[in-house]
A protein has these predicted regions:
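Acidic, glycine-centered active-site loop in nucleotide-sugar glycosyltransferases
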Residues: 103-104, 109-112
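Flexible glycine-rich beta->alpha loop in the catalytic core of nucleotide-sugar glycosyltransferases
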Residues: 54, 85, 96-97, 103
């Protein structure tokens, strides 16, 4: 059998018992199905994951998927903005704003998040 997949408010979480979701974590409530969290991810206090924005020119929503890969760590109060993939074992520093894909095994931080070093 494969790993347990749970949907928490529509968010897809692989192996929720091996995933940490801290206090005050907020998932986009309009399109939670666009958020996919793999096993062993740590979302610390205050992390926010957004999968849509309203386009001021059209009034419609621009959507994108957020995929957080196995073993990634997101520091306190990180904001993740669609469409983004955060690679396996990536570390995102506290207070960062992630606006683009983060490769596996890298440390990123800042607003916007920038490469710091390899793990």
């Amino acid at each position: 059998t494969g790993p347990l997949v749970c949907k928490w408010g529509g968010v897809q979480i692989i192996s929720p018992k091996r995933t940490f979701i801290g206090e005050g974590v907020i998932f986009d409530t309009n399109y939670p199905q666009d958020i996919f969290i793999e096993e062993g991810v740590r979302l610390t206090s205050g992390v926010k994951i957004v999968t849509h924005f309203m386009n001021p020119n059209t009034g419609s929503y621009d959507r994108g998927k957020v995929h957080i890969c196995k073993g990634a760590y997101l520091g306190m109060n990180t904001l993740v903005v669609k469409p983004v993939t955060i690679g396996e074992r990536a570390i995102i520093g506290a207070g960062s704003v992630v606006t683009k894909d983060i490769p596996a095994n890298e440390v990123w931080a800042g607003n916007p998040a920038k490469f710091i070093r390899k793990r």
